[in-house]
């Protein structure tokens, strides 16, 4: 089923573009949430007329993402974890743990924007990219340090 996006969806595309999606996805998610409309000739004309508005919205989203990227450029996130050897962690550090550590620093991000290729299993310093917009991906520094043992 062909749909026209009314807002940017990370896994699909940007506002104003036409996509072919599964009918169930369109009927059960995109249409009820107001994220897309069916791609009929009449709706295509309406979207063409509103194209300037969409372009303005895209520029605004990109500008906000670039401002956030500037804020994140020098961010350092320190996570304390239990270790069973000198450097091996008991569990692993996931994007959820990084999100929680950033939230503690008043940096609010969604977990899915943190592009951690695989969970971190050793102490050390890691560069982790954050996808804020399709072409805006700043990197933050994540330091994993051993938790002090209490005796």
Curated annotation (Swiss-Prot):
Transcription regulation as UniProt keyword: no
UniProt xrefs under InterPro entries: Ribosomal_bL9 (IPR000244), Ribosomal_bL9/RNase_H1_N (IPR009027), Ribosomal_bL9_bac/chp (IPR020594), Ribosomal_bL9_C (IPR020069), Ribosomal_bL9_C_sf (IPR036791), Ribosomal_bL9_N (IPR020070), Ribosomal_bL9_N_sf (IPR036935)
Listed Gene3D superfamilies: Ribosomal protein L9, C-terminal domain, Ribosomal protein L9, N-terminal domain
UniProt function note: Binds to the 23S rRNA.
Pfam family of the protein (one): Ribosomal_L9_C
Disulfide linkage: none
UniProt keyword annotations, A-Z: Ribonucleoprotein, Ribosomal protein, RNA-binding, rRNA-binding
Gene Ontology cellular-component terms listed: ribonucleoprotein complex; ribosome
Family: Belongs to the bacterial ribosomal protein bL9 family.
Name the record gives this protein: Large ribosomal subunit protein bL9
Single GO MF descriptor: rRNA binding
Transmembrane segments: none
GO biological process: one example: translation
């Amino acid at each position: 089923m062909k749909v026209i996006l009314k807002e940017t969806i990370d896994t699909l595309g940007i506002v104003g573009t036409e996509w072919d999606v599964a009918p169930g996805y369109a009927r059960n998610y995109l249409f009820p949430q107001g994220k897309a409309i069916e791609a009929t000739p009449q709706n295509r004309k309406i979207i063409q007329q509103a194209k300037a508005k969409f372009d303005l919205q895209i520029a605004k989203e990109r500008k906000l993402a670039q401002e956030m990227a500037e804020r994140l450029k020098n961010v350092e996130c320190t996570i304390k974890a239990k270790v069973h050897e000198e450097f091996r962690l008991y569990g692993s550090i996931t994007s959820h743990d990084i999100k929680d550590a950033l939230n503690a620093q008043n940096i609010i991000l969604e977990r899915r924007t943190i592009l951690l290729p695989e969970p971190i299993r050793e102490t050390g310093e890691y560069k982790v990219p954050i996808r804020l917009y399709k072409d805006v991906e700043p990197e933050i520094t994540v330091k994993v340090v051993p938790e002090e043992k209490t005796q």
